[in-house]
C-alpha cells in the first residue's frame, strides 16, 4: 500500500544508519518512506531480483531509518508503487505518457532493475514513431463509461456537464454568455492542469451546466450553474458563471493527486514488531499516527463526513 503523507521527525530526532538483517524475514512486512510516499511490502518482494533494494534488505548495504521505524529512501516516490508491482510479478502496466515512462525508467535505473528498464525502453521505442496529444479530454458516451473512467483514474477528476437542449423554458438574457464562459474556463483549466487532473466532458447528461469534482474514485463536490427564475410571469432558466467557486473546487481536488494514506489499523498491525520500544516512544508513535489520521479526516470532511475507515486496506 502507498500513501501521500510524510510527517517530519520530532525536533532533535535524527535518522539512524544501520544494517538491515533480512535473513529469514522473507514474509515480514517493512515500511518504506520514499521521498514522502509511504509504502508497505514484504522483504521477499524486495529481494526477489538482484537489485539495489535486494542489497539494502539483505544486509549488504546500510539503511537509514527514523525513530518511527520508517526506512528512508531519498528518491521520488511517484512511481515506487509501480516498481514494487514489477518486483512482485515480473511484469507491470506502464504509464501511457512518454514523460512518465521516462521518469519510471530513471527510477528503475537507480534501483538497478534491468528488466523494468528494458520494458520502458521498448515502450519508448514503440512511441517514438507515433505522436500522442499532450492534452486529452474524453467525451463520455455512457454512464458506465463515466464510472469506469473515474474509478480507474489515478488522478483527480473534473467533469463539466453541459447540454443546452435540456432546457424546458427560455433562457435569461445572460445565460448563453455564461454557458460559454463555463466552457471556456473548462478549456483553460484543462490546458493548465492536464498533467495533474483528468478532465472529462459530458454532453449527454440531464443537467444544463454542472461541474463535478472527484478524488480517489468518489465525488467530492458539485457546482450546479443553473436555476429556474420567474420573470414577466413565466419561468426562465438562468445559467450562472461561479468562477471563484470553480477555481476553489479545482484547487481543492488537487489535494487528492497522490495515493491514499495508510489507514490507522494497518499502521498498528505492521508496527507490532516494535512493541519492545520504551513507553515514551510508544506514546510518541501513537500521537504521530493520530495526527496523521486527524489531518486526513479534516481534509476529507469538507466534502464527506464518513470516517477514514470506510476505505479497505490493501498491502503492497
Swiss-Prot record:
Domain BTB per the UniProt entry, residue ranges: 28-96
Biased composition (Polar residues): 268-279
Transmembrane segments: none
Keyword annotations: Cytoplasm, Endosome, Nucleus, Phosphoprotein, Ubl conjugation pathway
Region span, Disordered: 268-287
Residues bearing the modification Phosphoserine: 278, 280
Record Gene3D superfamilies: Potassium Channel Kv1.1, Chain A
Record pathway: Protein modification; protein ubiquitination
Intrachain S-S bonds: none
This protein's GO CC annotations: Cul3-RING ubiquitin ligase complex; cytoplasm; endosome; nucleus
Pfam family, one: BTB_2
Source organism, top-level taxon: Eukaryota
Record-level GO BP terms: cell migration; immune response; negative regulation of Rho protein signal transduction; positive regulation of DNA replication; proteasome-mediated ubiquitin-dependent protein catabolic process; protein homooligomerization; protein ubiquitination; stress fiber assembly
Modification after translation: Phosphorylation at Ser-280 by CK2 facilitates the nucleus localization and increases interaction with PCNA.
InterPro entries per UniProt: BACURD1-3, BTB/POZ_dom, SKP1/BTB/POZ_sf, T1-type_BTB
Subcellular location: Cytoplasm; Nucleus; Endosome
Family from the record: Belongs to the BACURD family.
Family matches, as PANTHER family: BTB/POZ DOMAIN-CONTAINING ADAPTER FOR CUL3-MEDIATED RHOA DEGRADATION PROTEIN FAMILY MEMBER, BTB_POZ DOMAIN-CONTAINING ADAPTER FOR CUL3-MEDIATED RHOA DEGRADATION PROTEIN 2
Function: Substrate-specific adapter of a BCR (BTB-CUL3-RBX1) E3 ubiquitin-protein ligase complex involved in regulation of cytoskeleton structure. The BCR(TNFAIP1) E3 ubiquitin ligase complex mediates the ubiquitination of RHOA, leading to its degradation by the proteasome, thereby regulating the actin cytoskeleton and cell migration. Its interaction with RHOB may regulate apoptosis. May enhance the PCNA-dependent DNA polymerase delta activity.
Assembly information from the UniProt record: Component of the BCR(TNFAIP1) E3 ubiquitin ligase complex, at least composed of CUL3, TNFAIP1/BACURD2 and RBX1. Interacts with RHOA; with a preference for RhoA-GDP. Interacts with RHOB. Interacts with CSNK2B. Interacts with PCNA.
Protein name, per record: BTB/POZ domain-containing adapter for CUL3-mediated RhoA degradation protein 2
Amino acid at each position: 500500500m502507498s500513501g501521500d503523507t510524510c510527517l517530519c521527525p520530532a525536533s532533535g530526532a535524527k535518522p539512524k544508519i544501520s544494517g538491515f538483517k533480512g535473513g529469514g524475514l522473507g514474509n515480514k512486512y517493512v515500511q518504506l518512506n520514499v521521498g514522502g510516499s509511504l509504502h508497505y511490502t514484504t522483504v521477499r518482494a524486495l529481494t526477489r531480483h538482484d537489485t539495489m533494494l535486494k542489497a539494502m534488505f539483505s544486509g549488504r548495504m546500510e539503511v537509514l531509518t527514523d525513530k518511527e521505524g520508517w526506512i528512508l529512501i531519498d528518491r521520488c516516490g511517484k512511481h515506487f508503487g509501480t516498481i514494487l508491482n514489477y518486483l512482485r510479478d515480473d511484469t507491470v502496466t506502464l504509464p501511457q505518457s512518454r514523460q512518465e515512462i521516462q521518469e519510471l525508467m530513471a527510477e528503475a535505473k537507480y534501483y538497478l532493475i534491468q528488466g523494468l528498464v528494458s520494458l520502458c525502453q521498448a515502450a519508448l521505442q514503440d512511441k517514438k514513431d507515433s505522436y500522442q496529444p499532450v492534452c486529452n479530454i474524453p467525451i463520455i458516451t455512457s454512464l458506465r463509461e463515466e464510472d469506469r473512467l473515474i474509478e480507474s483514474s489515478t488522478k483527480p477528476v473534473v467533469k463539466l456537464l453541459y447540454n443546452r437542449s435540456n432546457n424546458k423554458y427560455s433562457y435569461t438574457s445572460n445565460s448563453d454568455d455564461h454557458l460559454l464562459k463555463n466552457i471556456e474556463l473548462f478549456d483553460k483549466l484543462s490546458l493548465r492542469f492536464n498533467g495533474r487532473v483528468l478532465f472529462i466532458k459530458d454532453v449527454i447528461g440531464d443537467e444544463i451546466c454542472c461541474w463535478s469534482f472527484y478524488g480517489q474514485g468518489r465525488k467530492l463536490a458539485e457546482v450546479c450553474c443553473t436555476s429556474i427564475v420567474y420573470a414577466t410571469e413565466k419561468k426562465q432558466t438562468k445559467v450562472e458563471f461561479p468562477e471563484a467557486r470553480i477555481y476553489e473546487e479545482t484547487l481543492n481536488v488537487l489535494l487528492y493527486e497522490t495515493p491514499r494514506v495508510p489507514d490507522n489499523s494497518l499502521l498498528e498491525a505492521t508496527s507490532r514488531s516494535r512493541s519492545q520500544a520504551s513507553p515514551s516512544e510508544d506514546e510518541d508513535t501513537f500521537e504521530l499516527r493520530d495526527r496523521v489520521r486527524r489531518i486526513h479526516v479534516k481534509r476529507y470532511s469538507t466534502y464527506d463526513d464518513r470516517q477514514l475507515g470506510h476505505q479497505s486496506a490493501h498491502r503492497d
